[in-house]
């Protein structure tokens, strides 16, 4: 696991909250999710702020709950999830299901983006042969070391792909 470089002490924020911490959140979201042009810094955690939080969480492989807790705050500060695990064949976890989902993106997204999907199996959270083949194909396309292991460079490119397809899935 890649260690978290900083510890953030901010309150947990959710839909309906107001105040200066929400303004700070909105400033980070404008920087991290610039494609949400209707997001304004007004200190109100409204539907647009919620959408921006969920998009950011999706793009950084965080739990998509719309709640800004410690890990989401840390990710907002550093621009990516702070606790990215090293994943490889045989692993079982929620992160793998999220990766499978991103690598499997729907045919209509494939047509729109002019890209193929990478994963064609069941989204089951198991890093098996199909997931490993998908990761290797993805690594090859991105000109990374093709080892089937999801380390920091592969995570970076997966987050780029998640950002690209988030327009279609959220």
What are the residue ranges of the model-derived segments?
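Cell-envelope/ECM-targeting effectors and their regulatory/trafficking segments
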Residues: 1-170
């Amino acid at each position: 696991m890649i260690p978290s470089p900083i510890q953030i002490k901010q309150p947990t924020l959710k839909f309906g909250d107001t105040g200066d911490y929400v303004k700070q959140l909105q400033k980070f979201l404008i920087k991290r999710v610039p494609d949400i042009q209707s997001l304004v810094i007004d200190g109100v955690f409204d539907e647009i702020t919620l959408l921006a939080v969920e998009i950011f969480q999706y793009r950084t492989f965080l739990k998509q709950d719309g709640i800004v807790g410690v890990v989401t705050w840390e990710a907002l500060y550093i621009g990516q999830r702070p606790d990215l695990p090293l994943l490889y064949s045989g692993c079982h976890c929620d992160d793998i299901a999220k990766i499978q989902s991103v690598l499997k993106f729907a045919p209509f997204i494939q047509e729109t983006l002019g890209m193929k999907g990478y994963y064609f199996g069941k989204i089951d959270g198991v890093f098996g042969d199909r997931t490993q083949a998908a990761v290797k194909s993805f690594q090859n396309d991105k000109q990374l070391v093709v080892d089937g292991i999801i380390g920091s460079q592969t995570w970076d490119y997966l987050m780029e792909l998640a950002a690209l397809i988030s327009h279609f899935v959220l």
